[in-house]
Amino acid sequence: MKLVIFDGNSILYRAFFALPELTTSNNIPTNAIYGFVNVILKYLEQEKPDYVAVAFDKRGREARKSEYEEYKANRKPMPDNLQVQIPYVREILYAFNIPIIEFEGYEADDVIGSLVNQFKNTGLDIVIITGDRDTLQLLDKNVVVKIVSTKFDKTVEDLYTVENVKEKYGVWANQVPDYKALVGDQSDNIPGVKGIGEKSAQKLLEEYSSLEEIYQNLDKIKSSIREKLEAGKDMAFLSKRLATIVCDLPLNVKLEDLRTKEWNKERLYEILVQLEFKSIIKRLGLSEVVQFEFVQQRTDIPDVEQKELESISQIRSKEIPLMFVQGEKCFYLYDQESNTVFITSNKLLIEEILKSDTVKIMYDLKNIFHQLNLEDTNNIKNCEDVMIASYVLDSTRSSYELETLFVSYLNTDIEAVKKDKKIVSVVLLKRLWDELLRLIDLNSCQFLYENIERPLIPVLYEMEKTGFKVDRDALIQYTKEIENKILKLETQIYQIAGEWFNINSPKQLSYILFEKLKLPVIKKTKTGYSTDAEVLEELFDKHEIVPLILDYRMYTKILTTYCQGLLQAINPSSGRVHTTFIQTGTATGRLASSDPNLQNIPVKYDEGKLIRKVFVPEGGHVLIDADYSQIELRILAHISEDERLISAFKNNVDIHSQTAAEVFGVDIADVTPEMRSQAKAVNFGIVYGISDYGLARDIKISRKEAAEFINKYFERYPKVKEYLDNTVKFARDNGFVLTLFNRKRYIKDIKSTNRNLRGYAERIAMNSPIQGSAADIMKLAMIKVYQKLKENNLKSKIILQVHDELLIEAPYEEKDIVKEIVKREMENAVALKVPLVVEVKEGLNWYETK
């Protein structure tokens, strides 16, 4: 007899991120549902279980977060496109007659652990189907775990048993929580012991059976490891508790409840037809499939000849699809004239082709530049990038992987791509480009692609290649200072509290604040008192311990997020960090940055800003920082055509003081700093569709006062109100909004019946044309500055772009001409009804330029 338990959340998440973006003709997202159903069917057919269940997380105050508020804090919220698919998954499971088991406040792993614990001694063979390795701790003589991953509609599995887990994972099943207690788990934000890596942890658990035994034998462990263990003891045991699956939830489930039952084929058929899952309907033999029409898939991939490319003269076509194959470290080119796929690893030959008059159609051109390690891109021409073209058409896609683009734009059969991915992909590139070009023309996006996004590619490539120098010694010193401040704060907090406690534990902190120190309770959760940032800010002046706790949280974030991450990112050869600028990473058109993310370097608090001191130029160079002044408000003035706003910017009036004067009904000379501060919050808040609640919270006034403030603002700036209302209406009528340069952002939930979702969508609609236009202007400016630096044969390089700020590393003797160039080109990037103003500063580190 066999029981199969599916980890619903894990399988669903992995299907969503692994599969291309799929939607029905009614725009229902379906990729996660499709992948999930295929996994369920595969293992129902393969395992033929007598009993079956699907475990899901269930919202509620999470038990682990009650102990450690940062647990999974690094996880992004569930994407909207995944959220809307969950009800369909549940409907399908009901139609399959598969029980859904969940328990409020606990994760699917805990439900699985409790089911295993309840039934493992009943003689059953138990198979756990999941996408992650957390459940390996549940392995037993009759319990196996199959780790599955989805690629298109193919499911790949990795089988773990109690016998092979040590060989494959490095520790025994019952040591998995101990292992995570030592090394941590980045995906769940489990801290572990600082400085203990995988090999050290495995060695320790080879010698000692558990975390407890390790700490009982500290005197036998070499000093370098022992010191780390001693310093991280509290975090180690906290991490073990977080990593240990709960196996005693009172699920109130009987084995008979899980018995495999007949499917409700009629209901199953209805749902699958609604989701347009033709292949699954056919696979299940559901009878009425012939009544429904589906779009014909394009599978007409020609048989092609394959040859080694030896000379550019072999190419006859005027347009050549060209792609880099990572696994083989070589390039594939398709010549339609001779119906030949040419293959080469000769980088000089590829560089020659990129410089030729032939039109090259590629995917991810910037990556190809990196593979060729080009010194410069001056003579590269006639290159098209389908990834960037697809981003221009839809900046809200969840994936820009090549296969997903084939499916979305060519309706290509997934199987056709899979049969010979490299050959099929390079052959289809030309078709894909033709379709994208047609849509770009249809949507009037030519300027956005040809003058902004495509010419930005070489700019970003050279920025990534150049990198940003980091003073490693200064960073290490700064890290030590932060660590010392944390230790000092801990000591002060414990002295005031009169006892040691885990400051990171909301439960223990709430006991100290609200029970021991008797501070007023601001907010409660299901499991106790809230200690979130909003609560602590309200308690700031109520007790001396509260500011210390806020400082402690600030410094620990600086340490873990910035100091430690940055140290690891320094290239040992160049002494610089080489971030990746992601051109397709945001819905607004802004650039994103990763590995490391240099766009989230702190700007909000003084101590965090100090980390900018470690970013320095090379010797004999200086950093030049150019920052647009109030660009989003200037764009708002331009788009709304509000006369008062336009007049203020044209006459170089302090816009925040003018707004304060208008709203408070005083002369501009009589505006107090407090009035200006409140007006500033309104000015910037309006751009983001701020509500009276949000404004009241931000400037600490009553909600009624905030509403009056906003109403007065709109009375004085009526065309701003008119613009915002018209923009929301346009979004509701069309499903998208546009920037000044025709960048389109689709707005989900703009017609939602859920008030919160609709309100959020309306705020996005208000802000996106403004923020997106600012991003487009910055990109135009970057291109112009880059070109002028080249034209003047200057050695200066653009090294970073963060929101409204551009940073250039210039030899000292070039700094004056560079400052002139950057100010002129940025201020004249585009002509608006108001002037663009750029503030230019210089310094010997990034901090000095601000």
UniProtKB/Swiss-Prot annotation:
The keyword DNA repair applies. One of its GO terms (molecular function) is DNA-directed DNA polymerase activity. In addition to polymerase activity, this DNA polymerase exhibits 3'-5' and 5'-3' exonuclease activity. Residues 1-288 form the 5'-3' exonuclease domain. Keywords: DNA damage, DNA repair, DNA replication, DNA-binding, DNA-directed DNA polymerase, Exonuclease, Hydrolase, Nuclease, Nucleotidyltransferase, Transferase. InterPro entries: 3'-5'_exonuclease_dom, 5-3_exonucl_a-hlix_arch_N, 5-3_exonuclease, 5-3_exonuclease_C_sf, DNA-dir_DNA_pol_A_CS, DNA-dir_DNA_pol_A_palm_dom, DNA/RNA_pol_sf, DNA_polI_H3TH. Belongs to the DNA polymerase type-A family. Its EC number is 2.7.7.7. The lineage of its organism: Bacteria, Bacillati, Bacillota, Bacillota incertae sedis, Caldicellulosiruptorales. It holds the Pfam family DNA_pol_A. Residues 470-850 are annotated as: Polymerase. This is DNA polymerase I. It comes from Caldicellulosiruptor bescii (strain ATCC BAA-1888 / DSM 6725 / KCTC 15123 / Z-1320) (Anaerocellum thermophilum). GO terms for biological process: DNA-templated DNA replication; double-strand break repair. It catalyses: DNA(n) + a 2'-deoxyribonucleoside 5'-triphosphate = DNA(n+1) + diphosphate. The keyword Nucleotide-binding does not apply. The gene is polA. It comes from the Bacteria. SUPFAM superfamilies: 5' to 3' exonuclease, C-terminal subdomain, DNA/RNA polymerases, PIN domain-like, Ribonuclease H-like.
